[in-house]
UniProtKB/Swiss-Prot annotation:
GO terms for biological process: protein catabolic process. GO terms for molecular function: leucyl-tRNA--protein transferase activity. Keywords: Acyltransferase, Cytoplasm, Transferase. It comes from Ruegeria sp. (strain TM1040). It catalyses: N-terminal L-lysyl-[protein] + L-leucyl-tRNA(Leu) = N-terminal L-leucyl-L-lysyl-[protein] + tRNA(Leu) + H(+); N-terminal L-arginyl-[protein] + L-leucyl-tRNA(Leu) = N-terminal L-leucyl-L-arginyl-[protein] + tRNA(Leu) + H(+); L-phenylalanyl-tRNA(Phe) + an N-terminal L-alpha-aminoacyl-[protein] = an N-terminal L-phenylalanyl-L-alpha-aminoacyl-[protein] + tRNA(Phe). One of its GO terms (cellular component) is cytoplasm. Belongs to the L/F-transferase family. This is Leucyl/phenylalanyl-tRNA--protein transferase. The keyword Zinc does not apply. The lineage of its organism: Bacteria, Pseudomonadati, Pseudomonadota, Alphaproteobacteria, Rhodobacterales. Functions in the N-end rule pathway of protein degradation where it conjugates Leu, Phe and, less efficiently, Met from aminoacyl-tRNAs to the N-termini of proteins containing an N-terminal arginine or lysine.
């Protein structure tokens, strides 16, 4: 199957997403889980240890500075669903303003990040990676803050892992997901405009919304 940016956007709007069996497999298939993972934007959990890590402020955050580097970081593992076709099409979505990344830097090195697709008030988190301890958690904390600031009402994680569950992620039924998706697509979401907060402001906002 040949992907296109328009086909991808149509698929996301209908609740399905693409995957490949491996990096070297050229084929792409559609996934529509019976149980869908979401990260409630008012229920993101920041543990004491993560709050302490955020306050250390020995990192910097950027948005859309190195989208390709984040996708490559996510694909740089023994088993990955990101093949060449998927990589290229998400670069196209990024160029068109529908796919975004959030990066974590330490000592001028990209050490973590997350990327996904934005449609209306829905953000479809595709993947994340970490090369330093807690870097992906830091990325998610800033992502959730950004989604809240930008007016998003749905953060789709596709599946739930123990890592996501520890941060507040949960599963809902396909029918419940479709209802939330339809509502989110009717809402405006702005990924670009919100300013990056300081760690102190991020933690204060989280306390106010939890």
């Amino acid at each position: 199957m040949t992907l296109s940016a328009d086909l991808l956007l149509h698929a996301y709007a209908n609740g399905v997403f693409p995957m490949a069996e491996s990096r070297d497999d050229p084929e792409v298939f559609w996934v529509d889980p019976k149980r869908r993972g979401i990260l409630p934007l008012d229920g993101f959990r920041i543990s004491r240890s993560l709050a302490k890590r955020l306050r250390r402020d020995d990192y910097s955050i950027s948005v859309n500075r190195d989208f390709a580097g984040v996708v490559q970081g996510c694909a740089d593992r023994e088993e990955t669903w990101i093949n060449g076709e998927i990589f290229d099409r998400y670069q196209e979505l990024h160029h068109d303003g529908f796919a975004h990344s959030l990066e974590v830097w330490m000592d001028d090195a990209l050490v973590g990040g997350v990327y996904g697709v934005s449609l209306g008030g829905a953000f479809f988190g595709e993947s994340m990676f970490s090369r330093r301890r807690d870097a992906s958690k830091i990325a998610l904390a800033y992502l959730v803050d950004r989604l809240n600031a930008g007016g998003y009402i749905l953060c789709d994680t596709q599946f739930i892992t123990p890592h996501l569950a520890s941060l507040g992620g949960r599963e809902i039924s396909r029918a419940a997901y479709r209802r939330r998706l339809a509502e989110a697509l009717d809402q405006p979401g702005d990924f670009i405009s919100p300013a990056l907060p300081s760690p102190q402001v991020l933690l204060q906002r989280r306390t106010q919304t939890s």
